[in-house]
Curated annotation (Swiss-Prot):
Chief localisation class: plastid
Name of encoding gene: rpoB
Full protein name: DNA-directed RNA polymerase subunit beta
Subunit structure: In plastids the minimal PEP RNA polymerase catalytic core is composed of four subunits: alpha, beta, beta', and beta''. When a (nuclear-encoded) sigma factor is associated with the core the holoenzyme is formed, which can initiate transcription.
Lineage: Eukaryota, Viridiplantae, Streptophyta, Embryophyta, Marchantiophyta
Pfam families cross-referenced by the UniProt entry: RNA_pol_Rpb2_1, RNA_pol_Rpb2_2, RNA_pol_Rpb2_3, RNA_pol_Rpb2_6, RNA_pol_Rpb2_7
GO molecular function, one term: DNA-directed RNA polymerase activity
Length: 1065
């Protein structure tokens, strides 16, 4: 049997980019047209096959450090021919620079790591559907989808008339479309399979006469397309307009579309014919007529065979095509200018690098599929590179996407993970590739299977797309491969034509490779996955991506076995490419000595990730020791001995404790703080730039007037903070003065007063220093002076300051397990108050037992009990999910047997009590009494998530107000206020606190006059006055109504008798 190894997780990105460099780039450059000027005097062409990519000027690491783009320059030979003189000029021209993919599978753009995610779209071709009209009669439609997303719909309505729908509201007879494409009626009737039926359907379309010629049909189609009434006469311009706007945009199939159309309609059109032909429309109409009479099948639009993946190669090739179109237009524009000025052009003067550079800059900067790489931990990077998005240009929108599109489909098996997706608006639209999935050249998702041979025991591996595996009976991955003798008798569950069947083993064609074949990398890291509800497994796989790398990483006791490959493929671990001897070793580099040369491996030292976590590598080898090829040289962040290590194995108990774990809240032991169990490092970057203003240049200095010397204590003579300084909130990091107009200061009354009394000159500059924001205290670890790439005139200098913080775990931080069991820390207990085991070990974390039954994530119980056994036996377990394929209750049996072994080996009978297996008697740390009920305890692998209270806590006493509503702004970053909504108002009304409610709705919110009056009252110590006018929000409502020509006024309605009672008014 052929042994199958796990594919490299980041391979999809590399394969896509290699295809672009090796095929897409030369293909697009070769398709660049020969350009002639209007007078046909000059002819310009480039030789795309002979292009050259220059070696990047900087290394990957230097590009990150200097905040520039890691790219390669493209050079191509160009030729300009003067036809009359027969003069030929040949030059090698610079087309522009293309960002290169680095060794991590990402792009460094302006010093920032970005990733291009794969897009999954409707595949071009034709799709048939049926729906009922308002009378309950079926309407059959065939939708032709072009390569660019344009659509042409053919339909047979309830009255058996055939239409071509050119927009939602406009449709024309199919005959008009076919005649406009150059056919005549006789040709059409000779080409269709059912001419009599076709003619009968056509006659029902309209009572008026059909167009007699192609010209009349073109006019008719043009009138319908542009909604033009009255008489219109044929002209060549109408034909060209229709060709460009209709046939080219809506009917360009591309290579994939042509293959799909040929397969669906059984055509033999050559693959290079990328536009829709009349014979395609005729074959499509034939199929539509067959559907009307019950022949043929309706397409399932959500099946993966009807969708394709746009990889990195396709997206970059589209951008290159756009850039070359812009270059073509710029060459034509230059030709026009050159002929007017009577200047002789050269190939170098014709070609400008701006179109290519700007197109790729726009794409990487603002395209929705080019995303800021999520670098919270190594797993996050891998999952981000393997993401599939249905959103983006040509795709779906989150507001209009239906439930059917978002749902799991049977064809996703082994290709798209049924578990891992976003929560909220993007659910089902953002997916993740399954662990073994591959993307073919045509954009189909493929999955590997073992082909079962009837003649021998050998099984070969084949890759099948979603369209191909429908014809096979496939045994599922959680079936056990039994002996040849027992296989023949056994009934096996299998997949066949999107359904699950139970068949004899001899009828099975293919077998799945791996029980985890159906799941993504994130879901595959969850042990005992099969015991969890899918919703909680989704949360678990998503929250692993939010885990912060800890100061002391620790690998999990219970895992699934793919932790090491995840760490290796993420690039955070340094691996030896050769065998040799470690000659030199320190914290910055490892020098490996080979027979004839030395290899220098530079390590990553306290580098900031995109998510402000710390990327740092520690050597794992010893000096003068010999190592082998593939051996781990250094561990990265969140890895331990080459394995992914996102959290910590800690002792947990499932029990209530004084109500402090109400609603998933969590109690922790103070040991986790003092022993730095959950301490993480975060590095924040602060930026300041000195610009050249209209009043003069800004300057960095340590001489800042009106600022306390204490705040400036860390600055050097240039006004920049010293590396290694410990800075607190409010300290100046970079001193900067900005010039301002002197005249305005002198015109101000206080300026004149100062001059008159003291003879003081008002300052000509104001301080615009970079200060440490609230919560930003820490150690300055790096200072970078950046020079801008484009050397723009108004930017003089940019400085980046990096501040490192060590954050211990605290109340308000979010922690989670791998099974979707998340919670917020509500209390930190002293060690002596924590419940403890019978051997005196205090519990580290108390979880709520009520969080398990209703959530149905029982996997956490199996994990924590097996972890407890592993901690006493000093064992690590790597268990592939779906172990029930061996026998019933296999997980439970394994856990209890390991607990029994641990109790025997350690002579602690309380580890496994037959009366309460998996539970223990705990002792209350405060009273010393045993708790009444036995309690489930174990070693769970708990993660500290990036949602930390230091980043979220916020308070406001005063701050900015919105200009229109005059209410406080929203959000922590804007120093905003807390929202008091209608429900909060109801609560205050329920308590009858009228004055507090009035203050909240007026003084504290948007009553401008009352705000000033309250300030004066507080200063003078007078009672706070009540607001007696309307707040700004009411005035805003009045103004908005006035803009609609509605005036609100108050009028006293009364009669002459002023003693009239109120009830009678």
């Amino acid at each position: 049997m052929e042994i199958f190894i796990l594919p490299e997780f980041g391979k999809i990105q590399f394969e896509g980019f290699n295809r672009f460099i090796n095929q897409g780039l030369s293909e697009e450059l070769s398709n660049f047209p020969i350009i002639e000027d209007i007078d046909q005097e000059f002819e310009f062409q480039i030789f795309g096959e002979q292009y050259k990519l220059a070696e990047p000027l900087l290394k990957e690491r230097d590009a990150v450090y200097q905040s520039i783009t890691y790219s390669s320059d493209v050079y191509v030979p160009a030729q300009l021919t003067q036809k009359k003189k027969g003069k030929i000029q040949k030059q090698i021209v610079f087309l522009g620079s293309i960002p290169l993919m680095n060794s991590q599978g990402t792009f460094v753009v302006n010093g920032v790591a970005r990733v291009i995610i794969n897009q999954i779209l409707r595949s071009p071709g034709i799709y048939y559907n049926s729906e009922l009209d308002h009378n309950g009669i079926p309407i059959y439609t065939g939708t032709l989808i072009s390569n660019w997303g344009g659509r042409l719909k053919l339909e047979i309505d309830g009255k058996t008339r055939i239409w071509a729908r050119i927009s939602k509201k406009r449709k024309v007879s199919i005959l008009v479309l076919l005649l406009a494409m150059g056919l005549n009626l006789q040709n059409i009737l000779d080409s269709v399979c059912y001419p009599k039926i076709f003619l009968e359907f056509i006659k029902k379309n309209t009572k008026k006469e059909y167009p007699n010629s192609t010209e009349d049909a073109i006019v008719e189609l043009y009138k319908h397309l542009y909604c033009i009434g009255g008489d219109l006469f044929f002209s060549e311009s109408i034909r060209k307009e229709l060709q460009k706007k209709f046939f080219q945009q809506r009917c360009e199939l591309g290579k994939i579309g042509r293959l799909n159309l040929n397969k669906k309609l059984n055509l033999n059109v050559p693959e290079n014919e990328i536009f829709v032909l009349p014979q395609d429309i005729l074959a499509a109409v034939d199929y539509l007529i067959k559907l009307k009479f019950g022949i043929g099948t309706i397409d399932d639009i959500d099946h993966l065979k009807n969708r394709r993946v746009c990889s990195v190669a396709d997206l970059l090739q589209d951008q290159l095509k756009l850039a070359l179109n812009r270059l073509e237009n710029s060459v034509l524009f230059f030709f026009r200018g050159a002929t007017k000025r009577k200047r002789l052009p050269t190939p170098k003067s014709l070609v400008t690098s701006t179109p290519l550079i700007m197109t790729f800059k726009e794409f990487f900067g603002s395209h929705p599929l080019s995303q800021f790489l999520d670098q919270t931990n190594p797993l996050t990077e891998i999952v981000h590179k393997r993401r599939l998005s249905s959103l983006g240009p040509g795709g779906l929108t989150r507001r209009t996407a239906s439930f059917q599109v978002r749902d799991i489909h049977a064809s996703h098996y082994g290709r798209i993970c049924p578990i891992e997706t976003s929560e909220g608006m993007n659910a089902g639209l953002i997916a993740s590739l399954a662990i073994h999935a591959k993307i073919s050249i045509l954009g189909c998702l493929e999955s590997p299977f073992y082909k079962i041979s009837k003649l021998s025991n050998l099984e070969e591996i084949i890759n099948l797309s979603a369209a191909e595996d429908e014809y096979y009976r496939i045994a599922t991955g959680n079936c056990l491969a039994l002996d040849q003798n027992s296989q023949e008798e056994q009934i096996t569950p299998a997949r066949y034509r999107q359904d699950f069947v139970a068949i004899a083993w001899e009828q099975v064609h293919l077998r799945s490779i791996f029980p985890l074949q159906y799941f993504s990398v994130g879901a595959s890291l969850i042990p005992f996955l099969e015991h969890n509800d899918a919703n909680r497994a989704l949360m678990g796989s998503n929250m692993q991506r939010q885990a912060v790398p800890l100061l002391k990483p620790e690998k999990c006791i219970v895992g699934t076995g793919i932790e090491s490959q995840t760490a290796l493929d993420s690039g955070s671990v340094t691996v030896s490419s050769h065998g040799g001897k470690i000659e030199y070793l320190d914290g910055n580099q490892i020098i490996l000595s080979l027979k004839k040369k030395k290899i220098d491996k530079n390590l990553i030292i306290y580098q900031r990730s995109n998510n402000s976590t710390c990327m740092h590598q520690k050597p794992k080898v010893e000096k003068q020791k010999y190592i082998k090829k593939g051996q781990i040289l250094a561990d990265g962040a969140a890895t331990a001995n080459g394995e992914l290590a996102l959290g910590k194995n800690i002792l947990v108990a499932y029990m209530p404790w004084e109500g402090y774990n109400f609603e998933d809240a969590i109690l922790i032991n103070e040991r986790l703080i003092y022993e730095d169990i959950y301490t993480s490092i975060h590095i924040e970057r602060y930026e300041i730039e000195a610009r050249v203003t209209s009043q003069g240049p800004e300057k960095f200095t340590n001489e800042i007037p009106h600022l306390d010397d204490y705040l400036l204590r860390h600055l050097d003579q240039n006004g920049i903070v010293l590396t290694g300084s410990w800075v607190e909130t409010g300290d100046v990091l970079v001193g900067k003065l900005t010039p301002q107009e002197t005249e305005e200061n002198l015109r101000a009354p206080e300026g004149k007063l100062l001059q008159a009394i003291f003879g003081i000159q008002v300052a000509t500059s104001k301080e615009t220093c970079l200060k440490v924001p609230p919560g930003g205290r820490g150690r300055v670890i790096d200072i970078r002076l950046i020079s801008q790439e484009d050397n723009s005139a108004n930017t003089a200098q940019i400085i980046h300051i990096y501040i490192l913080q060590k954050r211990k775990i605290q109340i308000g931080d979010k922690v989670a397990g791998r099974h979707g069991n998340k919670g917020i820390i509500s209390k930190i207990l002293p060690r002596q108050d924590m419940p403890f085991l019978q051997d005196g070990t205090p519990i580290d974390m108390i979880l709520s037992p009520l969080g398990v039954p209703s959530r149905m994530n029982v996997g956490q119980i199996f994990e924590c009990l097996l972890g407890l056994a592993g901690s006493f036996l000093h064992k690590n377990y790597r268990i592939i999910p779906f172990d029930e394929r061996y026998e019933r209750e296999a997980s439970r049996k394994l856990v209890f047997s390991e607990l029994y072994k641990a109790s025997k080996k350690t002579t602690n009978p309380w580890l496994f009590e037959p009366d309460n297996p998996g539970k223990n008697r705990l002792i209350d740390g405060r009273t010393g009494e045993i708790f009444e009920q036995p309690i489930t305890i174990g070693k769970a692998y708990m993660l500290k998530l990036i949602h930390q209270v230091d980043d979220k806590i916020h308070a406001r006493s005063s701050g900015p107000y919105a200009l229109v509503t005059q209410q406080p702004l929203r959000g922590r970053s804007r120093r905003g206020g807390q929202r008091v909504g209608e429900m909060e108002v109801w609560a205050l009304e329920g308590f009858g606190v009228a004055y507090i409610l009035q203050e909240m709705l007026t003084i504290k919110s948007d009553h401008i006059r009352a705000r000033y009056e309250v300030l004066g009252a507080i200063v003078t110590g007078e009672p706070i006055p009540k607001p007696n006018t309307a707040p700004e929000s009411f005035k805003l409502l009045v103004r908005e109504l006035r803009s609609l020509a509605l005036e609100i006024n108050h009028v006293i309605i009364c009669e002459k008798n002023l003693k009239l009672k109120l009830k009678e008014i």
